[in-house]
Amino acid sequence: MARTGRRAAVGRPARTSSLTERRRVLLAGVRSHTRFYKAFAREVREFNATRICGTLLTLMSGSLQGRSLFEATRVTLICEVDLGPRRPDCICVFEFANDKTLGGVCVILELKTCKSISSGDTASKREQRTTGMKQLRHSLKLLQSLAPPGDKVVYLCPILVFVAQRTLRVSRVTRLVPQKISGNITAAVRMLQSLSTYAVPPEPQTRRSRRRVAATARPQRPPSPTRDPEGTAGHPAPPESDPPSPGVVGVAAEGGGVLQKIAALFCVPVAAKSRPRTKTE
């Protein structure tokens, strides 16, 4: 009995360590998924704003059924979509509003992470691939039954992607046969967004972008005045004005004072009779 107790005592730490290792691997996979969603969402936002295509969107373009990525009028990324029995990692929807027959393409993406992409085809990766393919086929059937009806062609394209946990570098891509259905892609986007259980948090605004926004919102300063040889630098120069017309000068001379100032600017002496009288005179 003592030996049995010792064996049980020895076996407990091993079981605890295996559970700890499994939990550690699971948390590492969750962090990799979150970082992947963030990087993918950044590419989608940049493409919709600037039409610049990133690495992940270029990878998705292989499922667009011969269409160019730049023909898409809008790209939407929806993460962790709750389809009931299944929850695909993310669905990337490409809308083709200018196409007469094609409404859009829904790329159903299942993500698998691995420690290293240089380890080759291991037993763990083969198991992940088998599991991922089953998950994609199940998600495809569920999405077919939930798709809103419509009169345009919509392609459902399942894709399995392996990435490295640290670098998020894509190591392997497996595409299943796409399914062609009739539906409404705009209504499908709204439906998928309502079923999403994870929203990618907005990225914090960088210091450089804040400066750029503040510079565009701040009114421009007037140009600095030129240096005055008499030491009047830093004082704003008087605003330039058009030279007065003769009629205006005549009217000002009758009021007195203005003609004298104009004559002083051109170094022209003014007759004594045109000088305005002051109290000292």
Curated annotation (Swiss-Prot):
InterPro entries hit by this protein: Herpes_UL24 (IPR002580)
Leader peptide range in chain numbering: none
Spans annotated as Disordered: 199-252
Biased composition (Pro residues): 236-246
Top-level lineage group: Viruses
Induction section of the entry: Expressed late in the infection cycle.
Pfam families referenced in this protein's UniProt entry, alphabetically: Herpes_UL24 (PF01646)
Subcellular localization(s) per the UniProt record: Virion; Host cytoplasm; Host nucleus, Host nucleolus; Host Golgi apparatus
Keyword annotations: Host cytoplasm, Host Golgi apparatus, Host nucleus, Late protein, Virion
GO CC annotation terms, alphabetical: host cell Golgi apparatus; host cell nucleolus; virion component
Function as written in the Swiss-Prot or TrEMBL entry: May participate in nuclear egress of viral particles. Plays a role in the dispersal of several host nucleolar proteins including NCL/nucleolin and NPM1. Since deletion of host NCL/nucleolin negatively impact on nuclear egress, UL24 supposedly acts on this process through its effect on host nucleoli.
Family named by the database record: Belongs to the herpesviridae UL24 family.
Name of the protein in question: Protein UL24
Organism: Human herpesvirus 2 (strain HG52)
